[in-house]
């Protein structure tokens, strides 16, 4: 009989997911959403269940996956904020420092890095802990298998979680489903190539059609999502390389993927980073 169950909390901002993995008494939240308000809603779901929140596990250092961590921690002071590696912790600190410098944390000031200038900010170095292994065990029973040895892909460093009890792979942002993928600032061409290779590796490892694939953005799927993501990334590179302007590249991706969410942010920033307009500026 399965010990663990998984619930998806679908965030509205960025179409990002948080997941609650729980047994009868304890829970782990995987990723904490993009804003304080939605994280507070997530906290209420956990509180209403009557379970103890054991940990907030952040899969990688992009803000839509960790901005809500302080809100959850304040709701559940005994919960640990965990990452899989020192590299992911460093990514989180560095990204937050950069976001503060360009004003991207002005709407979420509680997550500005703590400093003399922002004494009420978040103490990333002190509050985020490194798991220190490849297994996270829930109090009350149930193991999560953590992997973080991926090369740079959608993020510089990334962790996935496999839940054997549920035959479920939580891919974080290695997969998106019905949502345009982030290939913007920081995602180099070589990282996209790595990403395609990693998806091939995951397809081979999780070939069982009964495996549930939980993406970082969008609805649950199955192992066919790995190939669909590879095609999407190939189409994206073909669009930004094959069109004369960013507008044309955007239009091509919209035609290929009608109904996909995040055209105005994730796709737009990705095209702006890789597209013909950026190449023209570099050549000038």
Predicted segments, located by residue:
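Conserved beta-strand hairpin/beta-sheet module of binuclear metal-dependent hydrolase folds
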Residues: 2-48, 160-173
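Short acidic-hydrophobic surface loop/beta-edge motif
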Residues: 9, 21, 133-139
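Loop/turn elements at helix/coil->beta-strand transitions in domains of secreted/extracellular proteins
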Residues: 25-26, 51-53, 77-80, 142, ...
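Short catalytic-loop micro-motif centered on adjacent basic/acidic residues
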Residues: 28-31, 55-59, 145-146
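Metallo-beta-lactamase
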Residues: 34, 143, 148-228, 235
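Extracytoplasmic/secreted cell-surface and envelope-processing proteins
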Residues: 38-39, 64-67, 91-92, 179-180, ...
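Active-site HxH/HxHxD metal-binding segment of metal-dependent hydrolases
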Residues: 48-137
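Accessory terminal helices/loops
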Residues: 153, 204-212, 219-284
